[in-house]
Amino acid sequence: MARLITVAAAQLGPIQKAEPRGVAVARMVALMERAHRRGVELVVFPELALTTFFPRHYHQDIAEADTWFETSMPSNETAPLFDAAKRYNIGFHLGYAEIAHEADETGTMRRRRFNTAILVSPAGDILLKYRKVHLPGHAEYDPKRKVQHLEKRYFEVGNLGFPVIAAPMGTQAQINMGMMICNDRRWPEAWRVLGLQRVELVMLGYNTPSLNMEAGGFEAHHLRVFHSHLSIQAGCYQNACFGVATAKAGTEDGCELFGHSIIVNPQGEIMAQATSWDDELITADCDLDMCTLGRTTIFAFDKHRRPEAYTRITDQVGAVDPEVWRG
């Protein structure tokens, strides 16, 4: 008998800087209601879903950016999402900016800021938390850039690794579920760490601009979308899992986000894709038994992986020049 779960990518249109959290939460609750009518069991919302993508804005005093962060979850403002989960018997994934009061690597207690995602059960319990590892952009104001990308200024590198949880969801007694956030999707190491935990369903949110604002050169819009999809499709195929990738889309604070949310199967095929720049719900019926073929044949890790040949991946960070041939 098939192990089916109906999932949804709940793409959000733009959230402007002046809009309060309550506006975004109300839109997400409406998407959950729509998902309920379609028989969805798990809804995936984007990265930083409660506010505008604030790392494009520069604050000289980082503490001034704290207005964009959550200090508790659920909070009074996000409680309607948890209530909707219980009302509609739907699990959900939510990306947000987190302030945590916890010890750092030296053991010092302090305020720490992370780009975070959580997985919430239909009962409103937080099943899993993930903090973004691969932070793009820069830490200081760059006058050469029309739009800043200051994730390295406002967030610390995630300290929870890439965890997977085996938990009930929908009608399934157990699903192996993991998360990543935005830029993580471009790093095959992230997918492989999840794959090595037999992940069956990967959830990720993103806020990706249509244009690459780096000074290094121009990247066409169609390539931006292609590279996003390529990363997700390859990750799902090479680790025999489903992926639900949900975007923020449209023109937000004058910056265009390309959207194109997708749901991908373990063969790397796109099962559903968003076509608008607005709030949009795309759904797919995922048979988790489809994960078995890949992980017992081509990607049977226990039979074919050779970690002794991959030590450079963990021993080295930047690229180095190869040995020069002296023929």
Label for each model-derived stretch:
Residues 72-93, 173-176, 182-282:
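CN hydrolase (nitrilase-like) catalytic-core segments centered on the catalytic cysteine
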Residues 12-33:
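N-terminal phosphate-binding loop and adjacent alpha-helix
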Residues 1-15:
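Short beta-strand segments enriched in small/hydrophobic residues
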Residues 49-66, 103-107:
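Metal-dependent catalytic neighborhoods of phosphoester/phosphodiester hydrolases
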Residues 27-42, 81-87:
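A short, N-terminal amphipathic alpha-helix
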Residues 83, 100-230, 297-300:
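Active-site catalytic loop in hydrolytic enzyme cores
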Residues 292-327:
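A short C-terminal boundary segment appended to hydrolase-like catalytic domains
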Residues 51, 118, 129-136, 262, ...:
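Short beta->alpha transition motifs characteristic of CBS
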